[in-house]
Amino acid sequence: EGNTIGEAIFDETTENTFVINEMNVPILCMGTKNIVVSASAEGILVSDIEQADRIKPYVDQIDQQIMYAEKSWGSYRVIDIEEESITIKVTLNPGHSMNYHSHEHRDEVWTILSGEGRTIVDGMEQSVRAGDVITMSAGCRHTIIAKTELQVMEVQLGKEINVHDKKVYELPATR
């Protein structure tokens, strides 16, 4: 017997097993009894039901970059982290945008996966849709504005990629 949020499969010997799965791959539980399984981009918890409420001191010891966040403008999920690159899938809600900003130590490449919107790169406005690729060099001011829900794969490239490398500007007047 299993209870689930997200995709999970339980065999006939499973008892009192609870699964919360935020990943896009299934979780298979076989012969499990009295456990909680929680899987997200932040990590995976497998715990006896009686111990699950003791998670906080252990989670506080984990030092890692946030891998998924929901914001007022949409959401993002970190797909991959390498020594000189980070790949992030960004979803912008219709009518929302990123700040008009620049980075001193990294280049960025946006690949539009779905939806429609517009970019402003160093004051130049351009319409974008699925399949378009926009490249920004370090120091370049840029933003993206969603007309419809917009999914963007953002690749950050550089030797010093960090969250503090961001300068925000006022958006220039556009059409």
Model feature map: region roles:
Residues 1-111, 116-121, 125-134, 143, ...:
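Left-handed beta-helix
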Residues 62-64, 69, 143, 147-175:
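Double-stranded beta-helix
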